[in-house]
Amino acid sequence: MNHLIISCIGPDKTGLVDTLSKVISKHQGNWQVSSLHHLSGFFAGVIEVAVASEKSESLISELKAINGLSCQIEVAEPDLPDVVSNLVLEITANDRAGIVQEVSSVIHHQNGNLIKLISSNDSAAHSGQDIFKAKAEIAIDDKSV
């Protein structure tokens, strides 16, 4: 069994997820984990698929041939559970360039691994000033805590 990490980007249009899921299903792949987004007119997605080793190459070829979608695919080992503590960090701040770099630098220097980052940009209710919001999931080795 192979685990494929599929990263796709292309102009958003209806039916892209249906197309991806049909191709994966055709090769008896099991869609396991995904994060799919519409960003400024583009579809961007990351999908983990488990598929039989003998079907991997044909699945990869067909995914790369989807019209209007650029897919990069890596074969990965499934995650083995490590002894880690997961922390959740929620950030709300006045928006400015460099916030993500500052946060990721602190996480890195504390031997943390940024597992997931979801961010958005909103307007403050009264002032209309740009507000940066983020929720980060961080894994820290229990030996480092």
Regions found by a protein language model. Give the residues of each.
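A conserved regulatory-domain signal marking ACT and ACT-like small-molecule sensing domains
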Residues: M1-V145
